Design a protein with these regions (language model features):
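Conserved phosphate/anionic-ligand binding catalytic regions in large, soluble enzymes, centered on
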Residues: 137-138
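Nucleic-acid modification enzymes, centered on SAM-dependent nucleic-acid methyltransferases
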Residues: 1-125, 141-193, 204-207
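Hydrophobic beta-strand segment of the Class I
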Residues: 132-133
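A short glycine-rich, Lys/Arg-flanked "PGG" loop and its adjoining helix->strand segment in the class I
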Residues: 201-215
Length: 215
């Protein structure tokens, strides 16, 4: 319930400093998302290995005839917790850092995370970046925003009050997404695929021009 959520958040805020509250809530939301990914009508049951496949294992979300039902209060939460903790440790290894225990007060490595449109990076000065690493979308191959909604609605419930600027809308923004999505251009007198491709190419051109400015 909403009252229970507020109480639990107040418990965290009373016990930990703000940065740690944000970190703990973020990790808990990732565990919750993984639980939903493994235990929904969109997850596929694989009888050969007696296991379930994640709903997001493919590039689309589809209802399954055969789906798993896992007890959320038993193995599911601990299984997903172990996966998230393992991923965190691997990321720390990748950047040559040690996983931070909850009582660590200071560390000398910092990372800045910003939420912004790739074609309007106003917070980055001209010629101030050494390298830009990106995995851009390719036309209509994957509808990222539609897939993101599967996780976004749960994260918004957990993190909406902690990171309000990241969860301003009920669902993800489909109009500004740089993909070719024909469903946005139906009944316009021109084949929707053609309009979707033009929209995608225009957005990608603006994005790469902005990246060039920053380099």
């Amino acid at each position: 319930s909403a009252a229970s959520d507020v109480y639990k958040r107040q418990q965290l805020q009373a016990e930990y400093e703000p940065d740690k509250v944000e970190a703990i809530a973020t990790y808990l939301s990732l565990i919750l998302d993984r639980c939903v990914d493994l235990n929904s009508r969109l997850s596929n049951w694989i009888p050969g290995v007696i296991s379930g496949a994640r709903a997001s294992a493919q590039h689309s979300l589809n209802l399954m005839w055969s789906y798993p039902e896992v007890s959320g209060s038993n193995k599911l939460w601990f299984l997903c917790y172990e996966a998230v903790a393992s991923n965190y440790s691997k990321l720390c290894t990748l950047i040559n850092a040690k996983p931070l225990p909850i009582d660590t007060q200071q560390h000398n490595k910092t990372v800045q995370i910003d939420s912004a449109s790739a074609d309007t990076l106003y917070h980055i000065p001209n010629s101030s970046v050494d390298a830009i690493i990106t995995d851009p979308p390719y036309y209509a191959t994957i509808q990222y925003a539609e897939l993101s909604d599967f996780f976004y609605v749960w994260q918004r419930r957990v993190l909406g009050d902690i990171f309000p600027n990241f969860y301003l809308t009920e669902l993800t923004d489909k109009d500004r997404e740089a993909v070719a999505n024909p469903s946005r251009f139906r009944n316009m007198g021109t084949p929707p695929e053609k309009l979707a491709n033009k929209d995608y190419e225009a957005k990608m051109a603006l994005t790469f021009a902005e990246h060039y400015r920053c380099l």
